[in-house]
Amino acid sequence: MATQRASGLLQRLAQGSLVKQILVGLVLGILLAWVSKPAAEAVGLLGTLFVGALKAVAPILVLMLVMASIANHQHGQKTNIRPILFLYLLGTFSAALAAVVFSFAFPSTLHLSSSAQDIVPPSGIVEVLRGLLISMVSNPIDALLNANYIGILVWAVGLGFALRHGNETTKNLVNDMSNAVTFMVKLVIRFAPVGIFGLVSSTLATTGFSTLWGYAHLLVVLIGCMLLVALVVNPLLVFWKIRRNPYPLVFACLRESGVYAFFTRSSAANIPVNMALCEKLNLDRDTYSVSIPLGATINMAGAAITITVLTLAAVHTLGVPVDLPTALLLSVVASLCACGASGVAGGSLLLIPLACNMFGIPNDIAMQVVAVGFIIGVLQDSCETALNSSTDVLFTAAACQAEDERLANNALRS
């Protein structure tokens, strides 16, 4: 009987809301650090194990996800929705640029266990590009062992294109391997509440409660940047497309898609909601049936913001100088990373080390930044998903309405 009760409890924990569990871990970590500093430092091992698990799974995750995505891509899909795809990519890049501006206007700092003396910063854009080129030609095994994400990305893209010409059995095997790695990532993520409990406890016990203000500032910068993109940048892109007041459409998408996505924290889970909204807006079914699932995969403005802001927070913390060309290159890298962040809980956080590599930041420190992301992830991930998913409908509607108006004008002229 006791065994059955224990099994039932574990099942409820495994199937329970991860957001609520992380909140509980966060609160318990704060309480433990306040009540007993030695105990809080002792449970820091839980946080160390969690970060170690993330470090172990992240390189193979990037390799398999990107390789499977390219290998299983359907030929000709892009041509049907070219204007929407362009808006997706432009919106993601614009979000990354906005995040760079926000990060320099309101610089955030993190509490990391390494000092600036451990970092050899690049002297400028030329050295950054040189480092990127050297990283690209790394041995694949060496890239995986040393978490060289640039090298991993190059090999994943190359193998993905090569496997496009393979038979279906091979593609299915790659897809199954990708699903298996994704399952392992989800398993690690399920331990996030325990890891956050250990990280928060040990961090507060070591650095004091002033650390909380640093996280609050970082969260304000992240959410503020997402609001800027949702209420200023995206409406400008929509206005450029439809040439009329974009805000009725913007608010409709935020209200009927963003709110659902905020609580589900999954662009994939929000696809049926977005499909229903597209039907309500009388959009072309052949278009949105392709663009909405595609948007859930590559339209990741929120992820681009998260990657950029957290990377620059680490850069500011370590005192690494950043010039304008390097910041622009970071926007491009963050946009590319964001497009590969779909389908994984915390996917944008796990791609932060790739952006950190640009500035010579070691993987150990980059994973501490990822851990900070998980601490603030209760709100960050919800806001990120709300922005991502609502933008899928917004850009689809903008492109469809612009095309309808073009056809109507052509009909009038003829």
UniProtKB/Swiss-Prot annotation:
HAMAP family (UniProt xref): Ser_Thr_transp_SstT (MF_01582)
Task performed by this protein: Involved in the import of serine and threonine into the cell, with the concomitant import of sodium (symport system).
GO BP annotations listed: serine transport; threonine transport
NCBIfam families, sorted: PRK13628.1 (NF010151)
Catalysed reactions listed for this entry: L-serine(in) + Na(+)(in) = L-serine(out) + Na(+)(out); L-threonine(in) + Na(+)(in) = L-threonine(out) + Na(+)(out)
Gene name of the record: sstT
Source organism of the structure: Salmonella arizonae (strain ATCC BAA-731 / CDC346-86 / RSK2980)
Disulfide bond residue pairs: none
Keyword terms, alphabetized: Amino-acid transport, Cell inner membrane, Cell membrane, Membrane, Symport, Transmembrane, Transmembrane helix, Transport
Designated name of the protein: Serine/threonine transporter SstT
